[in-house]
């Protein structure tokens, strides 16, 4: 796997979500990749995980993510799971695929807005 290429596509997808007028306010970035990016976690995480902040928007978010990811490649696999959508982006033959997972579980979580590499 070309780590730099994978990181590039992760950042492009994150930026596209951040710039989307609705998705940016519906998704909270979480998981190993967010820890790697914001807290310099030493292990390389290869997927993008989000919490959905409004569970009633699950279908809408699924459809919007599907359209958004098609700008970067093809959707190799996708499913609407019990706890939310999972989409797998294939951005090039022979490359590792990028999994995007959204959880619609409702937790008493607290989120903070953070800037990533000057993207705000």
Residue ranges and their predicted role:
Residues 1-30, 34-120:
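Compositionally biased terminal segments of proteins
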């Amino acid at each position: 796997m070309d780590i730099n290429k994978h990181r590039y596509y992760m950042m492009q997808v994150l930026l596209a979500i951040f710039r989307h007028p609705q998705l940016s306010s519906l998704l909270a970035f979480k998981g190993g990749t967010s820890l790697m990016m914001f807290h310099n976690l030493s292990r390389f995480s290869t997927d993008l995980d989000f919490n959905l902040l409004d569970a009633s928007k699950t279908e809408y978010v699924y459809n919007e993510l599907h359209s958004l990811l098609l700008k970067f490649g093809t959707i190799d696999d996708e499913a609407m799971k019990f706890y939310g959508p999972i989409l797998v982006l294939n951005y090039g033959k022979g490359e590792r695929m990028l999994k995007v997972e959204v959880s619609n579980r409702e937790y008493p979580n607290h989120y903070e807005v953070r800037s990533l590499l000057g993207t705000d």
